[in-house]
Amino acid sequence: MPTIEPIARGLVPVDSSAADLLGAPNYDEFQSDQEVWELLQQRPHSVLRVTMPHCAVPSLADILEEESPAALELAALNMQRLKAEPLVRQVSGVLWIYEIESPATARRPQIGLGGMARTSEIRTAANPAGTIIRNEGIKESKARGRAVLVEVTGCDMGTVNLAVDDDAGRLEAALRAYAGSRAPDYETRDEAGNLHRVWLELDPARQRQLQELVMAEPRAYVADGNHRSAAAAMLGVGVFQAVFFPAATMTIAPYNRLVREPARQVSDLRREIENYFEVQVVPPEDVPFQPLRTHVIGLYDGERWWRLLPRPGTFDPDDAAQDIDADIVQRLLFERVLGIGDAKDERLVFVGANRDARWLQSQVDAGNYRYAVTLPPVTMQQFVRVCLQGKLMPPKSTWFVPKIRSGLMMALL
């Protein structure tokens, strides 16, 4: 069973107006440093000055090298300034109920219980009985970069998104009842129009009731934040900030690709693709094409959109990881047709659902990229199946929405 503990020392916005000023997207939601810098110009009080300190500079020309000594020194300085500001207050021994209402999804609002999870419960080769299941390979340099930032600031801002089965619906029912019992302590709306509401719970008796519901779950799955949880383990702090969400309230959006150049010359693209896919021209009314059904893939070549359907026998449907369309595209289209065998190849650019198919098409039309590839969203059933088989998700295959907002709960270490 996974464990959730109260946050010993939390730093929170004093009210909704402060939450508006402090809140920000996570560090991995941006396509470029310029995007971060531009948002900081609009919202200089946001926690991006701490989470992306290399961009918290007067001009684009002044942007620092990420994770450089100068950037880390600036992060520590900005954290000290933040702690001294009237925008925040400290709370001790707190759990928090977190609800996100999204206008972009038809689902009911996503709701979860926030606190500290244990690094000792993460499932690894050395700890196969761990109840927090990762599903993504860890890049040590990326995790170490997050760890160093936590260390120099003395604060864990990178909340990990954990999904639990909640088959009986008891956790969701309890959280919704709680949220309906009183007004939130603060709320804020993000750039996409999502409404984030937070309730702080300090009473030990009520905390235990909620903790027991999480601890009744057999396992939790890391939906977002594999590297953030790994960073805590590297520091040896024993806990990391997390929110446990019932899986039924969660949504996965498409995670698409742009291709700069193929690694090999392809004289007849359609002919080569047809070795692995049935190829159909997308009708004008469906352009730009964003597939929503599993095993339907979109490809834009600068002239037209194609619908690609993997041929039988090109993947193993019983292998949960091979059944993910991102893996099918990587093996069959990128590797075999375009010669790009490594998903980390700089010719590939991964684009989350905060950019739509029209934007991808515009990038190809502008000559910035050769191809755009659109993938259907992974289903929660596919995601859980990969976890239960002990497999790893293909790189950049799940884009959970709406995203947890940085700056609404900060755990001081």
Task: For the regions a language model picked out, list residue spans one by one.
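Surface-exposed, charge/polar-rich loops and edge strands
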Residues: M1-L413
